[in-house]
UniProtKB/Swiss-Prot annotation:
Quaternary structure and partners: The 4 large subunits of the cytochrome b6-f complex are cytochrome b6, subunit IV (17 kDa polypeptide, PetD), cytochrome f and the Rieske protein, while the 4 small subunits are PetG, PetL, PetM and PetN. The complex functions as a dimer.
Record-annotated membrane-spanning stretches: 3-23
Keywords for the protein's UniProt record, in alphabetical order: Chloroplast, Electron transport, Membrane, Photosynthesis, Plastid, Thylakoid, Transmembrane, Transmembrane helix, Transport
Name of the protein in its database record: Cytochrome b6-f complex subunit 8
GO MF terms held by the record: electron transporter, transferring electrons within cytochrome b6/f complex of photosystem II activity
Length: 29
């Protein structure tokens, strides 16, 4: 796994995590 793939994977994980956090926060969970 090269650095570009690793960077993209990390970016997707952070984006998905923050997005789900916002959704859960608005749901009141």
């Amino acid at each position: 796994m090269d650095m570009v793939s690793l960077a993209w994977a990390a970016l997707m994980v952070v984006f998905t995590f923050s997005l789900s956090l916002v959704v859960w926060g608005r749901s009141g969970l």
